[in-house]
């Protein structure tokens, strides 16, 4: 027998053995428990916009991926909850159901409404313990009817033993174990339900760190591993109208991304009582892509003079929504073409990524 014939016989036997194993698995666990990917070709991943054009582009797929776990972390008053509420507003615009697990008991419904959230349809829970919060999340995800769930925040998911104990008692690692156990159960059901689970997290300073970044996030290491997206949001500078501070310029770094190239960043304005300024992004990205010409402090769009100074240009676009919409469509078309470019919104890959602290 030739060598080629012998090799074909071996391959045939291996294929028969594989088919038998697959058949046995399907009998034991049901059809769909195992499959070849060619039977289910890859499709474009569904996403929900973050409310920021630049951040949608930096994420690589046009927003936060459905069926995945996301972490948003940063210092106090950096815009974490604002960004999460914008995600809820965008999901509701698509007809989705959303839930907000308010572990901090600090949700401002008036502010949420100003950001575009339909608070009448928003499902809100203010749990007493971390266990209760995560059980509620599990029930909502398993229902298959929720598109976005926001947990605000990880630091406020206090274990029952800590709440029922005395103020000075030590409870090392309780919260980390609670999250680790919950995430092991939630990961698969979040994927099957095609739901976005967003955890908002705080940062702490690790004592005794001389070299490297002393900042750490709360809740242990499990969340870092189970998330598909991690967003580091920071306040860059204040936005002023004469002497009054009216908002913050904000930078978001995509420090982890399992669905597109990571280490990209986006900058946008968060205006008080308004949220993410889409008009500011249109001006900035219009200049970036060459649609808006900036000559000194003057901005123009073709023959149209937008105004002197960035704030005046934003004011003109606010008064002329047709021009703003036209510019936005052109920008989004350019982003769609270059979304997967390695240089678009790229940052240094050596960016310090926060470690996690076990509480």
Curated annotation (Swiss-Prot):
Keywords: ATP-binding, Cytoplasm, DNA damage, DNA recombination, DNA repair, DNA-binding, Nucleotide-binding, SOS response
Gene3D superfamilies per UniProt: P-loop containing nucleotide triphosphate hydrolases
Top-level taxon of the source organism: Bacteria
GO annotations of cellular component type: cytosol
Location in or out of the cell: Cytoplasm
Primary location recorded for the protein, binned into one broad class: cytoplasm
GO molecular function terms attached to this record: ATP binding; ATP hydrolysis activity; ATP-dependent DNA damage sensor activity; damaged DNA binding; single-stranded DNA binding
Binding residue positions for ATP: 74-81
GO annotation terms (biological process): DNA recombination; DNA repair; SOS response
Classification via InterPro entries: AAA+_ATPase (IPR003593), DNA_recomb/repair_RecA (IPR013765), DNA_recomb/repair_RecA_CS (IPR020584), P-loop_NTPase (IPR027417), RecA-like_C (IPR049261), RecA-like_N (IPR049428), RecA_ATP-bd (IPR020588), RecA_C_sf (IPR023400)
Keyword hit for DNA repair: yes
Described purpose of this protein according to its UniProt entry: Can catalyze the hydrolysis of ATP in the presence of single-stranded DNA, the ATP-dependent uptake of single-stranded DNA by duplex DNA, and the ATP-dependent hybridization of homologous single-stranded DNAs. It interacts with LexA causing its activation and leading to its autocatalytic cleavage.
Recorded family membership: Belongs to the RecA family.
NCBIfam families, sorted: tigrfam_recA
Protein's recorded name: Protein RecA
